[in-house]
Amino acid sequence: MLRITENELSADLFYELYISVGWEPPLKEQIAVALNNTIAAFTVYDDNNNPVAMARLIGDGGMSYYIKDFAVIPTEQKKGIGTMLMKHIENYIIKNLKPNWAVSLELISSKGKEPFYEKMGFEARPCEWDGAGMFKMVRYTN
């Protein structure tokens, strides 16, 4: 049976899961800082206690949450793990909301993965209310 843990994701495990999906990883020191400043980090383990997915939830805790580093290892994709993890994240947010609160939940999809997120209720940008999402990497220079 799959199991999800909260806030037990180490920098080393993050690194392993990150590269498993073909992403160029940040430095482990940078990962550790990011994890330390994350609202919640989620790790999914399979029946054999092998890590198969992760995600981080960042944001202000009041009006806006952002899903970052949502990754399911390629051999375990299309098995419902991502759906289970996304539902877990949404339930985590809901149980931490105050009465009458509504918050935005945002993310940037990997190319080609948009249908998964749309199935989970996310709306692509631009749309009727919003323009295109924007992205910029800022790098250290001396």
Enumerate the predicted regions with their spans.
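Short amphipathic alpha-helix that is part of the acyltransferase structural core
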Residues: M1-E29
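C-terminal "cap" of GNAT-fold acetyltransferases
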Residues: E6-N7, N100-N142
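Conserved beta-hairpin
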Residues: A32-L35, I39-A55
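Conserved acetyl-CoA binding element of GNAT-fold acetyltransferases
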Residues: M63-P74, K78, A132
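Conserved acetyl-CoA pyrophosphate-binding loop and the N-cap/start of the following alpha-helix
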Residues: E76, G80-H88
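Alpha-helix termini
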Residues: I93-N100
